[in-house]
């Protein structure tokens, strides 16, 4: 079984040492879906949510979150991000929204967590902004 790199031989958590790794361009992509009622999705698409343009705010929140990943994932390295993009595409047939992110940096460690964080927070933002339309 492979050894978990975030724990020492005694089982204590530690941040992985990447100081000897070569600096290279790193790119990661992530994606996810938010499912909702068709009426809710139509309200979002018609920009009838009083809080604002759901997709634009979700993109901004995803970008902001990707830059804060090391603050919320304890053993994630703080990195300098060169680029973050988010795309949000509605799928009316399946009553869902497809979210993708792409994150780029030049560094010694990857940006997978930043890409996943961007999608996760964008999805949470979409859900939060639609809460007033959701009947639980």
Where are the regions a protein language model picked out?
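N-terminal, polar/charged subdomain of small-to-medium soluble alpha/beta proteins
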Residues: 1-95, 109, 116-118, 131
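Glycine-rich active-site/cofactor-binding loop and its immediate structural neighborhood
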Residues: 100
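Post-transcriptional modification and biogenesis factors for structured RNAs
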Residues: 103
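Short Gly/Pro-enriched loop/turn and capping motifs at secondary-structure junctions
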Residues: 106
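Conserved catalytic cysteine-centered active-site region
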Residues: 123
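Conserved small/polar residues in nucleotide/adenosyl-binding loops
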Residues: 134-136
